[in-house]
């Protein structure tokens, strides 16, 4: 169990521009403040991930994404809400409301409301976060804290402990407008 003090410490670090590792539902994640360009580019460099691929935003609850939903049909919001919190990621139109270092070359952004207690507590404190698997490009995602340390020894600002959520697969990714499954879970 992760103490609230450690989660609050992680929140302070994120607000100050940190890149952190933390447990998620299936694998360890890397995250940072999506509005902090330097932090996002540092995260991308750690992963050797090109900016044009775009990144996932995670949140504590659907309301943290309200700024994106102003012109959305109500059934879209209901569709997402019926699958959250949980292992469902939706590609939604971002309407140029997010920076390109988050969206990449896409006109959509990937959103998920996590059901992992550590992630939810962290997002409740700081708002939506960038979330990507904790691994350098081409390597398997970290499933243990030891693997996180082996991959990124000394390069992360904080490693927030805790247990993985027990899922075996990453979240399913669907296009909200079409319903198409982009990545099975």
From Swiss-Prot:
It comes from the Bacteria. One of its GO terms (biological process) is regulation of translational fidelity. Disulfide bonds: none annotated. Required for the formation of a threonylcarbamoyl group on adenosine at position 37 (t(6)A37) in tRNAs that read codons beginning with adenine. Catalyzes the conversion of L-threonine, HCO(3)(-)/CO(2) and ATP to give threonylcarbamoyl-AMP (TC-AMP) as the acyladenylate intermediate, with the release of diphosphate. This is Threonylcarbamoyl-AMP synthase. Keywords: ATP-binding, Cytoplasm, Nucleotide-binding, Nucleotidyltransferase, Transferase, tRNA processing. PROSITE patterns: YRDC (PS51163). It comes from Pseudomonas putida (strain ATCC 700007 / DSM 6899 / JCM 31910 / BCRC 17059 / LMG 24140 / F1). The keyword Transferase applies. Its main location: cytoplasm. Residues 4-185 form the YrdC-like domain. It is found in: Cytoplasm. One of its GO terms (cellular component) is cytoplasm. Belongs to the SUA5 family. TsaC subfamily. It catalyses: L-threonine + hydrogencarbonate + ATP = L-threonylcarbamoyladenylate + diphosphate + H2O. Its EC number is 2.7.7.87. InterPro entries: DHBP_synth_RibB-like_a/b_dom (IPR017945), Sua5-like_dom (IPR006070), TC-AMP_synthase (IPR023535), TC-AMP_synthase_SUA5 (IPR050156). GO terms for molecular function: ATP binding; double-stranded RNA binding; L-threonylcarbamoyladenylate synthase; tRNA binding.
